Curated annotation (Swiss-Prot):
Location of the transit peptide in the chain: 1-38
Enzyme active site: 264, 266, 301
Catalytic activity: (9Z)-octadecenoyl-[ACP] + H2O = (9Z)-octadecenoate + holo-[ACP] + H(+)
Function: Plays an essential role in chain termination during de novo fatty acid synthesis. Possesses high thioesterase activity for oleoyl-ACP versus other acyl-ACPs. Substrate preference is 18:1 > 18:0 > 16:1.
InterPro entries assigned: Acyl-ACP_TE_C (IPR049427), Acyl-ACP_thioesterase_NHD (IPR002864), FATA/B (IPR045023), HotDog_dom_sf (IPR029069)
Protein's name according to its UniProt entry: Oleoyl-acyl carrier protein thioesterase 1, chloroplastic
One GO CC term, this protein: chloroplast
């Protein structure tokens, strides 16, 4: 479905929606790419925002009021309809002791803008971007890999603009990328990319992305590959080796809180980031800030699981061709290898790497 939020009078709305419906039935793919629009309410006219939903099955049009969240959200699809941008104010509870956003805050914002992008093109709100076919077959998206590079952390009160888009990733998954900017200066302050795979919600087994599902979301993806990071020799593609015992640093017996479960009933992927950081040595936390984090998600973690976080220092890895960290690693940077595992049987939950740089002088 395609959602159009516009401020129009009833008569103008009827004429516009008839045109939209006819155009969509004639050529739905090109219609979506040409005609996605978003109009915000204006105080001058006092008109109420309306939402038009064009059905891909019948070409029918349903009119309804935009939600309050739609009206307040500072985000919209870009002009071509193939990516989504949203602005966020960094709040007091999203910063650490140095008054800058934490990496968990950044990861939560990435997740939020991704979900809002999915909603803006008509995907389900009862899960993470599920399509009609996915809901019929009880399928959900789960994170397979997350890679985040932060060049400059936003401070309390700063406004961050995040752009996101998704695209196909082979036959078994999809990819979502993000670019973060300072809303005032336009400076790129971070980039991220992720890989998602499909899971059956009942059996908890991975499943290939069917052509039906692919057809439902590809119309909202760039036709040509668009990547936040260049593909050649970049850190986001590097294979992560498994950390073997004995680890240099560890935090044993971590337990998920009820609040750590997401709407798909497993531990939210941002929680794993916090667990990984729990075993970073305090002297690094005091003098460095996280620059790059890459995580591979190996298995689900349930509410009753008990988790061990293991960390070991690793040798330097080469720069990231085209990314802001390329060629900037120096003797003041520190890199670590991480492993999250079940305390009981040692099953691997997550493996990762982090790169830390010296904190800027205040």
């Amino acid at each position: 479905m395609l959602k159009l939020s516009c401020n129009v009078t009833d008569s103008k709305l009827q004429r516009s929606l008839l045109f939209f419906s006819h155009s969509y039935r004639s050529d739905p793919v090109n219609f979506i790419r040409r005609r996605i629009v978003s109009c915000s309410q204006t105080k001058k006219t006092g008109l109420v925002p309306l939402r038009a939903v064009v059905s891909a099955d019948q070409g029918s049009v349903v009119q309804g009021l935009a939600t309050l969240a739609d009206q307040l959200r500072l985000g919209s699809l870009t002009e071509d309809g193939l990516s989504y941008k949203e602005k966020f104010v960094v709040r007091s509870y999203e910063v650490g002791s140095n008054k800058t956003a934490t990496v968990e805050t950044i990861a939560n914002l990435l997740q939020e803008v991704g979900c809002n992008h999915a909603q803006s093109v008509g995907f389900s709100t009862d899960g993470f971007a599920t399509t009609t076919t996915m809901r019929k077959l009880h399928l959900i998206w789960v994170t397979a890999r997350m890679h985040i590079e932060i060049y400059k952390y936003p401070a309390w009160g700063d406004v961050v603009e995040i752009e996101t888009w998704c695209q196909s990733e082979g036959r078994i998954g999809t990819r979502r990328d993000w670019i973060l900017k300072d809303s005032v200066t336009g400076e790129v302050t971070g980039r991220a990319t992720s890989k998602w795979v499909m899971m059956n919600q009942d059996t908890r087994r991975l499943q290939k992305v069917s052509d039906d599902v692919r057809d439902e979301y590809l119309v909202f993806c760039p036709q040509e590959p668009r990547l936040a990071f260049p593909e050649e020799n970049n850190r986001s593609l590097k294979k992560i080796p498994k950390l073997e015992d004995p680890a240099q640093y560890s935090m044993i017996g971590l337990k998920p809180r009820r609040a750590d479960l997401d709407m798909n009933q497993h531990v939210n992927n941002v929680t794993y980031i916090g667990w990984v950081l729990e075993s970073i040595p305090q002297e690094i936390v005091d003098t460095h800030e996280l620059q790059v984090i890459t995580l591979d998600y190996r298995r689900e973690c349930q509410q009753d699981d008990v988790v061990d976080s293991l960390t070991t220092t690793t040798s330097e890895i080469g720069g990231t061709n085209g990314s802001a960290t390329s060629g900037t690693q120096g003797h003041n940077d520190s890199q670590f290898l991480h492993l999250l595992r079940l305390s009981g049987d040692g099953q691997e939950i997550n493996r990762g790497t982090t790169l830390w740089r010296k904190k800027p002088s205040s």
